[in-house]
Amino acid sequence: MTTTPPVLSGPEIRQQFLNFFADRQHQILPSASLVPEDPTVLLTIAGMLPFKPIFLGQKSAEFPRATTSQKCIRTNDIENVGRTARHHTFFEMLGNFSFGDYFKSQAIAWAWELSTQVFKLPAERLVVSVFEEDDEAFAIWRDEIGIPAHRIQRMGADDNFWVSGPTGPCGPCSEIYYDFHPELGDEKLDLEDDSRFIEFYNLVFMQYNRDNAGNLTPLEKKNIDTGMGLERMAQILQKVPNNYETDLIFPIIQTAANIAGIDYAQANEKTKVSLKVIGDHVRSVVHMIADGISASNLGRGYVLRRLIRRVVRHGRLLGINGEFTTKVAATAVQLAQPVYPNVLERQSLIEQELQREEAAFLKTLERGEKLLADLMADGVTEIAGADAFTLYDTFGFPLELTQEIAEEQGITVDVEGFEKAMQEQQERSKAAHETIDLTVQESLDKLANHIHPTEFLGYTDLQSSAIVKAVLVGGELVDQAVAGQTVQIVLDQTPFYGESGGQIGDKGFLNGDNLLIRIEDVKRESGIFIHFGRVERGTVQIGTTITATIDRACRRRAQANHTATHLLQSALKRVVDEGISQAGSLVDFNRLRFDFNSPRAVTMEELQQIEDLINQWIAEAHQTEVAVMPIADAKAKGAIAMFGEKYGAEVRVIDVPGVSLELCGGTHVANTAEIGLFKIVAETGIAAGVRRIEAVAGPSVLDYLNVREAVVKELGDRLKAKPEEIPDRVHQLQQELKASQKQLEALKQELALQKSEQLLTQAQTVGEFKILVADLGTVDGESLKTAAERLQQKLGESAVVLASIPEEGKVSLVAAFSPQLVKTKQLKAGQFIGAIAKICGGGGGGRPNLAQAGGRDASKLPEALATAKQTLLAELG
């Protein structure tokens, strides 16, 4: 008998999935942040990503079974969003996981039970796939579940074999598909036919380890990793034609349609695509900002900026000309908040980020679209790479936006030319990025397979005995190291704090019989503490018993700075905005740094209030209380957790009663009075929506004030002024400098005009127009523009092109065309000078009658001017 699937809401599907596996001894875990711990990916792209260290054997599982609803973002198919029934950037992956517990038979049985008994999908509408060599899975589906063999499709490794990389854990997978058109029969089951089938449940059986030679050996502990797309199951159960029309997304689409004055049901396909893009992208944007991501031009910040810009762009295509994103986001927040309360908590931050990005991009669109329209006029089939780069460099137009707009007009973009023009900036950008040496990390991963995690004693002990478990030189395991060598040492236990949570690692010494190792840093990875240092005396080898002693003075400074950082976050929330959240931190021996999400700078008055409040808390001598408790209890108490951090079932809570309550694994003072004094030294913006406060505490405050006093004294001596007179004296000098610069600019312009007056006799007459092309030497760009305008006015109906080299290697170009010339000859100064500038390796543009451009190759200037003259003679003759 055929069953009819119930019509379930998205939240009901999510909860029924989690309840099903909770009833089968799975621990329900909250979704991890979209900012992953895994440094190899920008964003959380799969439900299994938070468990990857467990699957790779780098970390032990706290539970044998788990189930989650994981928020994910993927942008690799962004161009398909809205154009297909089920491509998204944001989606939720429902998953059940086994870490060395149940395996293939049980996973398949539960997947089938959930699909047919809970969600009541008719068995005759389900088709499954297995890896072509996985006879075991095929037999389970056929013999234990009872699926006819012809409805079990064997597929190749590309579709049905999961790998974590070239080597490591891997295994076959099996997928369940829903058949929208069973009336077509079973004769030809093509699972790649998206109009008929939708894959909604993927079961990965991690049962092998692949070595360097490609050989597969069975794993001792086999794992299960599954994923069910929430949006896909909602499409099936809600009986709608695509994921976008489910209750998970359609309310957002409807909000956008209402703003645009559009009836979705009557809209054409192009309009629906734009509405779907907005519906999808706004979900991504809301969750990304809520998880602490701010728009920028790098990494995940750029992904966010690109998504926001696509929302704005598609809004424009719908005829929405004003700001609208916050209204659409409000609907997304309401849909998300029952499951993701942090979204509602950060709604004001989300709105501020969207308002700022939308306003900035609308200006970019207005400027860039005008130039782009000119570039696409007159039957152009391709936009030159240099022009695309000008749009990017001058107007902030991303290449993909130029491509998107051009594609709508059937025009291509010279991407190779764009990349060539971009090369220098790319090289500068690469040079600015820190090179990460993974050698030691790779060694640690190897060590983690046969060395127990290091026991940390440093919360209570500043000195302890320990046994050397591993010695590394240059990141390679060695048997021993001798005096003079730089080493990395792993101990069975240690009082040294390993760098984490923003706090720097301890310094100190390892002592033994005729052995002394100076430790300069300690890092913690894969549960192992690695001590970086230099052997000063003797020989160290595996099994050596040593005494580990930390530098107490450095520890005291670090813990004072760390507690001060907690006080700083609390003060920021009280003085500036309760919605402020941490975006990063650094706790050093001599200073501290705190990064936080804020759409605006902190004012001088607010900074003073924050500083005063922290010093008040220090003077009040609050005791610091440390407790370890279940994470649920900590959150119930209101403890602040940092987004992006992954916490275990038990967490360490640092409580300064009535002042601050945070989850933290760092070291802290026992009483705030130990901090001594606190001083803010800087507040800056480090990215869009991210601010940074730098400060000093304790003895470092005195060091800071001594340096400031010396600077003030030197300034007073140089300015011949008392300290209190320095501001007035500096203001006086600034005014004098400003007046001098004004006089200098006037002289430069006068000189340029005098030079230009001498050129009038060089003008060449062509028909009813005059042409003047000349090089004015080293005149600056502004003076060049003034001269070109003046000459054109004096010559009457004319075309004037002037050039100069204001500084070494840099070319300035200006074109001034009379109105009649523009009208009758259809010549536009912007297009003309842009083409000439390309000869000098540059670009530019402007109005039809007046435009400026620049170039990077001054040696090509004579050729550029000759081309300009020849072109004008040909066009006007």
Swiss-Prot record:
GO terms for molecular function: alanine-tRNA ligase activity; aminoacyl-tRNA deacylase activity; ATP binding; tRNA binding; zinc ion binding. This is Alanine--tRNA ligase. CDD domains: AlaRS_core. Consists of three domains; the N-terminal catalytic domain, the editing domain and the C-terminal C-Ala domain. The editing domain removes incorrectly charged amino acids, while the C-Ala domain, along with tRNA(Ala), serves as a bridge to cooperatively bring together the editing and aminoacylation centers thus stimulating deacylation of misacylated tRNAs. GO terms for biological process: alanyl-tRNA aminoacylation. Zn(2+) binds at residues 562, 566, 664, 668. Binds 1 zinc ion per subunit. Keywords: Aminoacyl-tRNA synthetase, ATP-binding, Cytoplasm, Ligase, Metal-binding, Nucleotide-binding, Protein biosynthesis, RNA-binding, tRNA-binding, Zinc. It comes from Synechocystis sp. (strain ATCC 27184 / PCC 6803 / Kazusa). Catalyzes the attachment of alanine to tRNA(Ala) in a two-step reaction: alanine is first activated by ATP to form Ala-AMP and then transferred to the acceptor end of tRNA(Ala). Also edits incorrectly charged Ser-tRNA(Ala) and Gly-tRNA(Ala) via its editing domain. The gene is alaS. It is found in: Cytoplasm. Belongs to the class-II aminoacyl-tRNA synthetase family. PROSITE patterns: AA_TRNA_LIGASE_II_ALA (PS50860). The keyword Signal does not apply. It catalyses: tRNA(Ala) + L-alanine + ATP = L-alanyl-tRNA(Ala) + AMP + diphosphate.
